[in-house]
């Protein structure tokens, strides 16, 4: 649970905020999450085993059944915006793993995924003479089958090829997703990995973009360029006796979800890439490792929460326009002396998406609030038997593009580059680990993280543009018990 808001705001003040927002009431927000999970798995060996004399080991084919139930409830309000969602999910999976030999194996299975979602969203923005009340209830059931073949040569080569097909009842479509992975030990110290796979994901647009509720904007589930052509949408008065009486509301003819139901929430993306790892000697034999990674995710359909089209609105829509993310990463690890480890990493991200513009065109822009690069250096030293462990980390966070608040992309700015430092000391005493540490040692904080904070009940209010730490220097201490 999390309660926040203006100074001295309490949960008991919510009703006053709802009714007297225009009379100086305090702004507040609260998120309550509840989750219940149950899991069952049964497996048994079947058929004869395969024996490898070199490995002195036996593998048995097996069959397994897995059942998983998850219930997640989230209730949240941000000022006048109110969200209530319950997700009940049941997953059933039956699989058979067959070993032809130590080198060849095949996994086949069938799976069903049942999901029942009860969601409602109230987005009153009386300062814009508009509001939205949305019923987002839906049932998403999916059944499918899959197969995965693995070929392995110990310490040399591993090849995995898989495919699955799923029918989704909500979209009334059949989806095929092939995937592959290869690992090749070119030499004992040089390893090449590669993978590629097509993926689909049905998005939960509110919980995936919960930050849109922390604004004073009007939310619409439709492309801004198509808004005027929406035949199902109608405008009408709110109940005059409501807290926001007299203002108009954006409703739809089917009871509040017409535009939402027309939204194609099924994202489609292809991810491909690989890595090259080299183990080498600096001081003692094979004491260092250097690896290079590159992965690209190409979106063929993506869901966008666009707050840059208009200063008063947030448009949530699907787009098949150009959208991708390229990630480059270099990792270096070295143990120059016994019990002293050095780890360094650098990651560069080029993430772009296409958004609609008011003149009817589109623009390929840098994805907002995604750091262009991150660098990290970690030093760790432990005494004999790990009685003392000293850990220091330095982190450099690169700039990210901040979404424009005016609707004009020329007004978009970049966040600054900033460092972060962390330190921890651990003392081992028997089965106990006693530790003390400090986070954000330099006490770096984002300045003015809330836009238009002095007028929270307005379209200009926005507390979702967060690119840096909000908490300053933090000291902590703790105790761990090791039972094994």
Short names for language-model regions:
Residues 1-106, 110-115, 284-286:
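Outer-membrane beta-barrel domain signature, strongest for Gram-negative TonB-dependent receptors
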Residues 42-48, 96-98, 151, 165, ...:
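Residue-level signature of outer-membrane beta-barrel architecture
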Residues 287-303, 307-405, 480-482:
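Gram-negative outer-membrane beta-barrel transporters
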């Amino acid at each position: 649970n999390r309660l926040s808001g203006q100074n001295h705001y309490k949960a008991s003040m919510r009703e006053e905020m709802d009714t007297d927002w225009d009379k100086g009431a305090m702004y507040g927000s609260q998120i309550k999450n509840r989750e219940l999970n149950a899991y069952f798995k049964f497996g048994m060996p079947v058929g004869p085993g395969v024996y490898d004399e070199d490995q002195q080991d036996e593998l048995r084919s097996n069959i397994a059944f897995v059942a998983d139930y998850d219930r997640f409830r989230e209730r949240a309000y941000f000022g006048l915006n109110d969200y209530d969602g319950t997700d009940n999910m049941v997953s059933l999976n039956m699989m058979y793993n067959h070993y032809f030999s130590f080198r060849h194996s095949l996994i086949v299975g069938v799976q069903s995924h049942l999901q029942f979602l009860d969601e409602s969203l109230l987005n009153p923005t009386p300062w814009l003479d508009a509001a939205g009340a949305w019923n987002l209830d839906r049932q998403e059931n999916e059944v499918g089958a899959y197969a995965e073949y693995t070929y392995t040569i110990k310490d040399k080569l591993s090849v995995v090829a898989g495919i699955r097909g799923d029918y989704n009842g909500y979209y009334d479509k059949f989806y095929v997703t092939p995937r592959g992975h290869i690992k090749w030990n070119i030499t004992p110290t040089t390893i090449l990995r590669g993978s590629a796979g097509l993926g689909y994901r049905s998005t939960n647009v509110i919980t995936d973009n919960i930050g849109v509720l922390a604004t004073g904007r009007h939310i619409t589930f439709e492309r801004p360029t198509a808004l005027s052509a929406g035949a199902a949408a109608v405008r009408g008065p709110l109940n005059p006796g409501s807290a926001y009486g007299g203002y108009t509301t954006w409703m739809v003819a089917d009871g509040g979800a017409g535009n939402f139901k027309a939204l194609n929430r099924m994202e489609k993306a292809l991810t491909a890439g690989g890595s090259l790892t080299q183990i080498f000697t600096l001081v003692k034999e094979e004491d260092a490792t250097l690896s290079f990674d590159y992965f690209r995710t190409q979106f063929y359909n993506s869901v966008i929460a666009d707050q840059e089209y208009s200063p008063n609105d947030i448009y949530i829509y699907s787009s098949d326009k150009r959208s991708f993310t390229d990630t480059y990463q270099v990792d270096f690890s070295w143990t120059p002396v016994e019990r002293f480890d050095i780890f360094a990493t650098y990651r560069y991200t080029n993430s772009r998406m296409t958004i609609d513009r008011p003149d009817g065109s589109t623009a390929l822009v840098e994805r907002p609030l995604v750091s262009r690069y991150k660098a990290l250096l970690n030093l760790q030293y432990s005494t004999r038997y790990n009685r003392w462990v000293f850990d220091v980390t330095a982190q450099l966070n690169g700039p990210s593009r901040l979404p424009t608040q005016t609707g004009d992309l020329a007004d978009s700015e970049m966040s600054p580059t900033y460092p972060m430092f962390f330190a921890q000391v651990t003392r081992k005493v028997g089965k106990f680990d006693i530790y003390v540490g400090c986070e954000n040692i330099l006490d770096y904080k984002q300045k003015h993280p809330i836009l238009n904070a002095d007028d929270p009940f307005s379209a200009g209010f926005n507390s979702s543009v967060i690119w840096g730490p909000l908490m300053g220097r933090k000291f902590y201490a703790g105790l761990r018990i090791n039972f094994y």
